[in-house]
From Swiss-Prot:
Listed GO biological process terms: ribosomal small subunit assembly; translation
GO cellular component: cytoplasm; small ribosomal subunit
Pfam families found in the cross-reference section: Ribosomal_S19
Record family assignment: Belongs to the universal ribosomal protein uS19 family.
Organism: Syntrophomonas wolfei subsp. wolfei (strain DSM 2245B / Goettingen)
HAMAP family given in the database record: Ribosomal_uS19
Gene name tied to this protein: rpsS
Molecular-function GO terms, alphabetical: rRNA binding; structural constituent of ribosome
Purpose: Protein S19 forms a complex with S13 that binds strongly to the 16S ribosomal RNA.
Protein's name in the database: Small ribosomal subunit protein uS19
UniProt keyword Glycosyltransferase, yes or no: no
Keywords on record: Ribonucleoprotein, Ribosomal protein, RNA-binding, rRNA-binding
Origin: domain of life: Bacteria
Amino acid sequence: MGRSLKKGPYCEDKLLKKIELMNQSGQKKVIKTWSRRSTIMPEMIGHTLAVHDGRKHIPVYVTEDMVGMKLGEFAPTRTYRGHAGKSEKSSRAR
């Protein structure tokens, strides 16, 4: 279930203020954030945000196509290493 249209998109206030300051000054610095729940706003286009995945920060370069999505969608939290392969023991038992 999505967020009510009446409320509007959620974005961390501190994160938006940092981006607005950087837009005014023209800086392009990596911004560290733990706010995976924040919605990507049009003001964020062209900035690199380091989104926390629970272990480390993953750099995410924001493009136009990402507007409206959540920051957490671009920083996966689980690493899939694949299922166990066939071992010699199981093949010999047959």
